[in-house]
Amino acid sequence: MKLSTILVAFVLLIITVILSTPSTNAKALAESNALAVADPEAEPWLGALFSFIRFIAPYVIKAIRFVVQVASKLVKPAKAAIKFAKNIAKDIAEDMAMDFAMDVITGGDDE
């Protein structure tokens, strides 16, 4: 799984949890109503959107920082593991090719 897929899933999980909290919905609705009263020309959903963005921004920033910290700790070992796996795969492929070539030359295993 790619890191971007994990990041998107994590952000969607956070948004789902925050939206499912009743106090969050009530707070956003109250701020939306306050904005609508202050400016009768404003769309109600626009006020709710701005209040939601204002509310969720610190959590998103914290989540991004956490993901960056975790990714920075995992990238170096992952690169080393990938390099090791590539070397092993290369060795195995060379051995298999050598065995196949020997079988073709000798006519197969007649043990």
From Swiss-Prot:
Keyword Signal listed: yes
Subcellular location, principal: secreted
Compartments it resides in: Secreted
Tissue localization of expression: Expressed by the venom gland.
Any single Gene Ontology cellular-component annotation: extracellular region
Domain of life: Eukaryota
Keywords attached to this entry: Antimicrobial, Secreted, Signal
Propeptide: 21-44
Signal peptide start-end: 1-20
Role according to the record: May have antimicrobial properties, like most ant linear peptides.
Family: Belongs to the formicidae venom precursor-01 superfamily.
Name the record gives this protein: U-myrmeciitoxin(01)-Mg8b
